[in-house]
């Protein structure tokens, strides 16, 4: 991608980054971590400044530093948080197009909140992953889901130790189905999860 190409050009060697998370089309990442090996003598803390001079305006590096050789961003003890912002009104707002999903049917945030209790915890999320998911296990732990409305914006924030391909997008879609009255909170969520015994 753009980051690998820019790093390779900057450092004069082929660079392949490993990121903590993937980002789908239309997704903005804040606080994503990436690591790469290099033979450069450039101090780690200076790389972010040089990168930001070359990267497109919609990509910014907040910090760069040297890490231990065994550091891997996907496997460090941390949680990931995804946030979906839904513009919930009759007509779209052009200035929100890049940062929200437009949905014109009225959403009942209280019902959406009620449905989250069935999704929090350790579950088999097999029915919450996209067809491309090729993993050893579909068991994941969701540590928190918050849903709130601020004016016309409904926000769904999902936190967990790791997610399957498209899992958060499917969780958000399920909560939207509950919020528009298509399903009661308990039915739609229980259909999709099976509690580990």
Pin down the residues of each PLM region.
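Structured-RNA-binding interfaces characteristic of tRNA pseudouridine synthases
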Residues: 1-194
């Amino acid at each position: 991608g753009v980051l690998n190409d820019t790093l390779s050009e900057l450092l004069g060697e082929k660079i392949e980054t490993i990121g903590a998370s993937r980002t789908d089309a239309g997704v903005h990442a804040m606080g994503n971590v990436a690591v790469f090996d290099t033979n450069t003598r450039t101090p780690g803390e200076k790389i972010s400044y040089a990168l930001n001079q070359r990267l497109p305006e919609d990509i910014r590096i907040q910090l760069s530093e040297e890490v231990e050789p065994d550091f891997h961003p996907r496997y460090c003890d941390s949680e990931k948080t995804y946030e979906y912002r839904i513009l919930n009104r009759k007509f779209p707002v052009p200035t929100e197009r890049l940062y929200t999903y437009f949905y014109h049917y009225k959403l009942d945030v209280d019902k959406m909140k009620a449905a989250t209790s069935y999704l929090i915890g350790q579950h088999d999320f097999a029915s919450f992953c996209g067809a491309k998911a090729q993993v050893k296990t579909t068991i994941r732990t969701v540590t928190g889901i918050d849903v709130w409305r601020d004016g016309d914006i409904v926000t769904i924030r999902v936190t967990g130790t790791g997610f399957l391909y498209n899992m958060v997008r499917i969780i958000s879609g399920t909560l939207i189905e509950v919020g528009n009255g298509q399903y009661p909170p308990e039915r739609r969520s229980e259909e999709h999860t099976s509690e580990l015994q």
